[in-house]
């Protein structure tokens, strides 16, 4: 498989045919892209606890608006949901890619998500109540890299963290 970034000092994970909605996975990926891994995991845990809504940028038809504190002010959008199933699976995969990075000798507190993407998987059929039904499937790819300039003890605004993650991504490009 060809990648757009150099794979030195990058831990990656590619999950095939996860039983989650592709649309939900795309919106969650947009929310946590270029963030530190620990912060992304905290945000997803808040989504599971229904404290923080996932902002829906692309697939926002008939999506309700949320209260002022439920969507992070960085995103400047009011549409949001709490996609539990997709959040659980993506959180599980983030834990897995963190273990991959630890095996490569990286510091887990300085990891940034430099690439996360969700694509449609193989949509097969399953039997439900004697009838056949379409099965949801999503491919998920995640890459994390260690940012030497990041100090986990310091408090950064979300915009600055996204900028740091994007700079790290651009430095890894071939």
Curated annotation (Swiss-Prot):
List the GO terms this entry assigns under cellular component, sorted alphabetically: cytosolic large ribosomal subunit
What are this entry's molecular-function GO terms?
rRNA binding; structural constituent of ribosome
The answer, when asked if Lipid biosynthesis is one of the entry's keywords, is no
Superkingdom per UniProt: Archaea
Q: Which GO terms describe its biological process?
A: cytoplasmic translation
Q: Transmembrane helix: is it a keyword of this entry? A: no
Which InterPro entries does the UniProt record give?
Ribosomal_uL22, Ribosomal_uL22_euk/arc, Ribosomal_uL22_sf
| Annotated keywords | Ribonucleoprotein, Ribosomal protein, RNA-binding, rRNA-binding
The entry's family comment says: Belongs to the universal ribosomal protein uL22 family.
**Quaternary structure per UniProt?**
Part of the 50S ribosomal subunit.
Provide the function of this protein: This protein binds specifically to 23S rRNA. It makes multiple contacts with different domains of the 23S rRNA in the assembled 50S subunit and ribosome.
Protein name (record): Large ribosomal subunit protein uL22
Which gene carries the instructions for this protein? rpl22
């Amino acid at each position: 498989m060809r990648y757009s970034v150099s794979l030195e000092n990058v831990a990656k994970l590619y999950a095939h045919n996860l039983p989650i909605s592709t649309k939900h996975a795309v919106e969650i990926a947009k929310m946590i892209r270029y963030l530190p891994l620990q912060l992304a995991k905290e945000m997803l845990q808040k989504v599971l606890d229904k404290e923080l809504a996932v902002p829906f940028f692309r697939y926002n038809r008939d999506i309700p608006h949320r209260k002022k504190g439920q969507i992070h002010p960085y995103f400047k959008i009011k549409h949001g949901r709490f996609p539990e199933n997709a959040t659980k699976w993506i959180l599980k995969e983030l834990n897995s890619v963190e273990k991959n990075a630890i095996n490569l000798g990286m510091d887990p507190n300085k990891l940034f998500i430099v690439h996360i993407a969700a694509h449609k998987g193989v949509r097969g059929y399953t039997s439900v109540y004697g009838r056949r039904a379409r099965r949801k499937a999503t491919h998920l790819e995640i890459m994390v890299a260690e940012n030497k300039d990041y100090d986990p003890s310091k408090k950064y605004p979300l915009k600055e963290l996204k900028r740091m993650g994007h700079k790290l991504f651009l430095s890894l490009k071939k």
